[in-house]
Amino acid sequence: MLIVSDTTPIITLMKMGHLDILKHLYGKVLIPNAVYMELTGNEKFVAEVSQVIGSDFLKVEEVDNEVAVTILQEVSGLDAGESEAIVMANSRKADLLVMDEHKGRGVAKKMGL
């Protein structure tokens, strides 16, 4: 099963101390570079960053189409993490996109995700 996640669901689980739920449910979860940067570069989550860096199931990968990411950001107003997650899920035919933002879910749904 191929799973792609955006930033906020991971942050929520990290803050609760239950990031491992994703591992138990899905085994491996792909996150695009922008999501990784949002997770590890935010000063609010310094205490939780080790959960991401030390994770054996969160796999950071590059998106295949940066042009699509840029266009999606410009057209939809989504941020880099949301846009990269949607483009990655679409291009890799993911079974599930984990995203909590209403606007992002709406865009993903219109794209058939």
Where are these regions (language model features)?
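Active-site-proximal, substrate-binding regions of enzyme catalytic domains
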Residues: 1-95, 102, 111-113
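Active-site-adjacent loops and short helices of periplasmic peptidoglycan-processing enzymes
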Residues: 105
